[in-house]
């Protein structure tokens, strides 16, 4: 009987290496870089496929966990879907990694405006974003105009609206429409102020 056991042990020992022909699990290697995932995600956004876009932005973060553009893009998707808490999280994370990031700063300000809260922080964020020369400047001024109208700071609102009008390209019809709406609101507010004699 002991001899039978020893033969069984030898056979098992010999067969184990013989299984090396079986396929081994291979770790998935993502062929795309973080910027490539971002580009693909942005193309999905343009096509209206927010779920696919979100998946690509998340994949970019798997490649580079501190990739600021992916946090901003996820914040933009969340803001577009009215998920303000999620948008705030993503923009805050972007600002933790890049404190002067103008897009994240302005968009976080817009989140707070939408929530009707933290108006002092809105102004600070917008002013921070304005310190960087970028094509965003008219949008940041629009953010400030919206804030000042909410605060009934009509002179300040008028000033930033004039600045935004002066630098908004005529081809940017969506922003020009928004600025026109703000000017109309400003005119209404001025008309409610009693004339002083």
Predicted feature descriptions by range:
Residues 38, 45, 72, 79, ...:
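Position-specific recognition of the canonical hydrophobic site in helix A of tetratricopeptide repeat
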Residues 36, 70, 104, 139-140, ...:
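TPR alpha-solenoid repeat register
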Residues 29, 63, 97, 131-133, ...:
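Structural marker of alpha-solenoid helical repeat scaffolds
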Residues 21-27, 143-197:
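Terminal, low-structured helical/coil segments at or just beyond the last alpha-helical repeat
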Residues 33, 67, 101, 136-137, ...:
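Residue-level recognition of tetratricopeptide repeat
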